[in-house]
Design a protein with these regions (language model features):
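Cytosolic regulatory regions built on CNB/CRP/Popeye-like sensor folds
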Residues: 1-148
Length: 148
């Protein structure tokens, strides 16, 4: 991948504020995977091992309630990320993520990212700062929904 292709990923919340070459370095730690409609990429209740950035496609975030009925919580598309909470929490996945259409994903190993953090990789630290901003934004949105 060259710099102009990296710039496409600059709108990914985890990569906010990173330079194209830093985004390229992070993408170098990932692998591209392709999934077909109906593929369960993340299973509710499973231990987190990877997180993903959607290069192209549409996936649903689905929660199963007490009577085993699936409820779509969100629909994700190009340049959205999911599974990233596994970087900061060992909690099992709170929802499933299922492909709605054929999709291309960038798959990042959580273990590899943690190794890089242990090695004090500056770019990965900056990505985790992006994760902190994303979590803060989600909490703010959740609070606004409760109040409004």
């Amino acid at each position: 991948m060259d710099a102009p292709r990296f710039e496409r990923y600059s709108s990914v919340p985890l990569f906010e504020g990173l330079q194209p070459e830093e985004i390229g370095a992070l993408l170098g730690y990932s692998e591209q995977v392709e999934v077909e409609p109906g593929t369960v990429v993340i299973q509710e209740g499973a231990e987190p091992t990877d997180f993903y950035v959607i290069a192209e496609g549409v996936l649903d975030v689905v929660l199963t309630d007490q009577v085993e009925e699936a409820k779509v919580l969100a629909r994700l598309s190009d340049l959205s990320c999911f599974g990233e909470m596994g970087l900061v929490s060992d909690e099992s996945h709170s929802a499933s993520v299922i492909a709605v259409e054929s999709s291309r994903l960038r798959k990042f190993s959580i273990a590899r990212m943690k190794e890089l953090l242990d090695m004090e990789d500056r770019t990965v630290y900056r990505m985790v700062l992006g994760l902190a901003r994303l979590i803060a934004h989600r909490l703010q949105m959740s609070d606004e929904r409760r109040v409004g």
